[in-house]
Amino acid sequence: MLGPAADDFVRTRLTHSLEVAQVGRALGQALGCDPDVVDTACLSHDLGHPPYGHNGEKALDVVARQIGGFEGNAQTFRILTRLEPKTLDAAGRPVGVNLTRASLDAVAKYPWLKGRGPGGPGGRSARKYSSYDDDAEIFAWMRQGAPEGRRCIEAQIMDLSDDVGYSVHDVEDAIALGRLDPACLTDSKEVDELLEATRAWYGTDLSADDLGAAFDRLAGRPYWIRSYNGSVADAAHLKNLTSEIIGRFVSAVASATRQTYGNGPLTRYEAELVIPEETAAEILLLKGIAVRYVMEPREHEPVYLRQRTLIFDLADVLMTGGGKGIDPVLLDVWHRAENDDARLRVVVDQIASLTDTSARAWHARLCGMFSEV
């Protein structure tokens, strides 16, 4: 996701989260979930993502390697339960926003500590997890009585809504910004290259034929857009495309889940979200379009290296500054820290709280130079 400075049309984490909540609310309502729980999960799911998105996440993981690493989902949990100063404990320390178990659990996309889920310390759970060891106590409280390693249905809805939200709207952005000319997708060679790029990027088990069939299904719908010149009519057509595709996905998943689990309210661990294979293939295809026409062309741009360097610079200057530059809301934690590891976690929390714009401003102020990132 590009920052707003790149183009005013492009979405931010906030607008993306609002769109995810809209999708999640529709699907949750169709399945009889508690709307507040689903809404909370969808609106909160990206709180822990640092400046520069996944590129910044990789940089902070390097910075935090000696203290257990950095992961955006675990940072989200830390914000909700430790960092946000809405509720204080007896010692006056922040303990988050005081959410219920159900709401916190619905945010847990990867419901395990680092290395304690699928694949163990050397597997997937070492890369994707929902809590640091520092926060294990409150994580254990949240998961009390929950099946080990299993996500509640509200978390599954949040995760799918996230996929739907960014896959559909990234395609919308690519077309509106001129990165993708829909007319090029009438060329069979171009489509073949798109399918291969999708499979290469996501490492999917789906064959090119499976993805090709998904493309044919979507491109065969009357609302599919075949050209775009920025006119009012085309802009309306593009907006209608996003609405129709989102509705298609929500209806397919709701129908399949209802066929399996019946018509009663489906909450917590009473059901698993059922995603038809064709729907999963169509979602992956749209994600592949975003990869092919937005992510791949930017993947090796010098800006990515500059972003990581900026984060490394900030970590160094904050760590060696004796608390100088740390926000007042985190300064008490810094002064209470008993060792450098604890202070480094404060520095990571601080950098993760910044936006792209504020990270550049902090770098210019603290590192004594103007950032061109």
Predicted regions and their residues:
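Alpha-helical phosphate/pyrophosphate-handling elements in metalloenzyme active cores
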Residues: 6-37
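Short, amphipathic C-terminal "tail helix"
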Residues: 339-372
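Catalytic phosphate-handling regions of large nucleic-acid enzymes and associated NTPases
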Residues: 4-16, 47-52, 63
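Short alpha-helical catalytic segment bearing the HExxH-like zincin motif
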Residues: 38-43, 159
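Hydrophobic (often cysteine-bearing) scaffold residues that line and stabilize catalytic clefts
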Residues: 16, 52, 56, 72, ...
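Sequence-structural signature of the catalytic-core scaffold of metal-dependent phosphohydrolases
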Residues: 22-25, 30, 47-237
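C-terminal subdomains that position terminal phosphate/3'-OH groups for nucleotidyl transfer/ligation
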Residues: 199-338, 342, 354
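Glycine- and acidic
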Residues: 3-9, 41, 147, 227-232, ...
